[in-house]
């Protein structure tokens, strides 16, 4: 189990409160699909994913990105119990969707990049460290069913 200090929790929740989940979620998933094109195979039903502009403008990518980032809100509310929080999603992604758990780590890293671009100077090394710890812990929780 990952332990978050009070300072880390404050850094995470402070930034989360300013986050536009719809915008950042679509951007994060879109960037994942552009930078790591092999991840597109999990989104065959999303329509046109033929170019970066098609991906970033795709309404299904934006909608699913919002859904994904909304689940990070659950992580923030349950930082001390991520394994239980993501048990059902882990099972879904493992048993039904067969998603490589490495993709969770990649998405987390993309999210950290999105945060850095959106928050600039406010995204200090300390804030980055807290968020990196969270996205890593979420990736581990999502990959739990695979073990």
UniProtKB/Swiss-Prot annotation:
Name all Globin domain ranges.
3-147
Task: According to the UniProt record, list the residues that bear Phosphoserine.
Answer: 14, 51
Alphabetized, the UniProt keywords read: Heme, Iron, Metal-binding, Oxygen transport, Phosphoprotein, Transport
Tissues in which the protein is found: Red blood cells.
MF term (GO), any: hemoglobin alpha binding
Stretches of the chain forming a coiled coil according to its record: none
Q: Could you describe the subunit structure of this protein?
A: Heterotetramer of two alpha chains and two epsilon chains in early embryonic hemoglobin Gower-2; two zeta chains and two epsilon chains in early embryonic hemoglobin Gower-1.
Query: Which family is it part of?
Result: Belongs to the globin family.
Its name, as the record gives it, is: Hemoglobin subunit epsilon
